[in-house]
């Protein structure tokens, strides 16, 4: 099933690129939470939703672009969790750092994850405790790697005082910034060692990257030390968290 989901992510990426490569300035609307949504978000959502319903008609889908009501999903034990276009701000700026995120959740845990960056043509995916990166037709298994000083990856679009204070107290380190769930993937492939997050994220932002990072040997915990949990709840917001190899 993993290969079929990877192909769905590629198909969604193709739909996104049709909008991305257009000559017109990027048009977008604002959702209720003031986050932007574009025609590419909707096109990718449609591709993934139709594909998953064909592939696994018995598994419900929770997508950022059409989340079911709480009453519908409150008892879900197994479901797909999808962000058709993670990093819409990056997409609007045409800076390449946006992804398609697809995760399978079982009993609150992401057991399969696919992250595809369509401009970069890089795919990360994980299942059954193993993680891979595929680029230019070459697939390799990935795992975390220690480095001193550690490289800390942070959000390109979200910074806050808590993060600034945390980094000041961290000790010797280097930083890099990148958009979307690629931050999880940098830790998973050994390019970075830590991704701290204090600002708001939603479950669809993190689930696929979470699966990949853990399969590669990283830990994904909130600031109280608890693993991020995807058991259905009324709010889609995550607590603050960190992805770390330590």
From Swiss-Prot:
Belongs to the inositol monophosphatase superfamily. CysQ family. InterPro entries: CysQ (IPR006240), CysQ/Inositol_MonoPase (IPR050725), Inositol_monoP_metal-BS (IPR020583), Inositol_monophosphatase-like (IPR000760), Inositol_monophosphatase_CS (IPR020550). HAMAP family: CysQ. One of its GO terms (cellular component) is plasma membrane. The gene is cysQ. Mg(2+) 2 binds at residues 83, 86, 205. It is found in: Cell inner membrane. It holds the Pfam family Inositol_P. Its cofactor is Mg(2+). It is a peripheral membrane protein. Keywords: Cell inner membrane, Cell membrane, Hydrolase, Magnesium, Membrane, Metal-binding. It comes from Salmonella typhi. It catalyses: adenosine 3',5'-bisphosphate + H2O = AMP + phosphate. Gene3D superfamilies: 3.40.190.80, Fructose-1,6-Bisphosphatase, subunit A, domain 1 (3.30.540.10). This is 3'(2'),5'-bisphosphate nucleotidase CysQ. SUPFAM superfamilies: Carbohydrate phosphatase. Converts adenosine-3',5'-bisphosphate (PAP) to AMP. Its EC number is 3.1.3.7. Substrate binds at residues 64, 85-88, 205. GO terms for biological process: 3'-phosphoadenosine 5'-phosphosulfate metabolic process; phosphatidylinositol phosphate biosynthetic process; sulfate assimilation. The keyword Cell membrane applies. The keyword Kinase does not apply. GO terms for molecular function: 3'(2'),5'-bisphosphate nucleotidase activity; magnesium ion binding. Disulfide bonds: none annotated.
């Amino acid at each position: 099933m993993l290969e079929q989901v990877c192909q769905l992510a590629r198909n969604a990426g193709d739909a996104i690129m049709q909008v991305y490569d257009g000559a017109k300035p990027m048009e977008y609307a604002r959702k209720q939470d003031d986050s932007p949504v574009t025609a590419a978000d909707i096109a990718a959502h449609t591709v993934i939703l139709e594909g998953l319903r064909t592939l696994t008609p018995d598994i419900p889908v929770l997508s950022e672009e059409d989340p079911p009501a709480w009453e519908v999903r409150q008892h879900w034990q197994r479901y797909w969790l999808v962000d058709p276009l993670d990093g819409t701000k990056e997409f609007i700026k045409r800076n390449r750092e946006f992804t398609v995120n697809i995760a399978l959740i079982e009993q609150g845990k992401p057991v399969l994850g696919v992250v595809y960056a369509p401009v970069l043509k890089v795919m990360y995916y994980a299942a059954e405790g193993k993680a891979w990166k595929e680029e230019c037709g070459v697939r390799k298994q990935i795992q975390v790697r220690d480095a001193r000083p550690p490289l800390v990856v942070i959000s390109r679009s979200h910074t806050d005082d808590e993060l600034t204070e945390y980094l000041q107290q961290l000790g010797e380190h280097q930083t890099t910034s990148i958009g979307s769930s690629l931050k999880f993937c940098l830790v998973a492939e050994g390019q970075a060692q830590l991704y701290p997050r204090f600002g708001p994220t939603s479950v669809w932002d993190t689930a696929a990257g979470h699966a990949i990072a853990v399969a590669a040997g990283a830990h994904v915990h909130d600031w109280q030390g608890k693993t991020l949990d995807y058991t259905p709840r009324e709010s889609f917001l995550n607590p603050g968290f960190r992805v770390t190899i330590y």
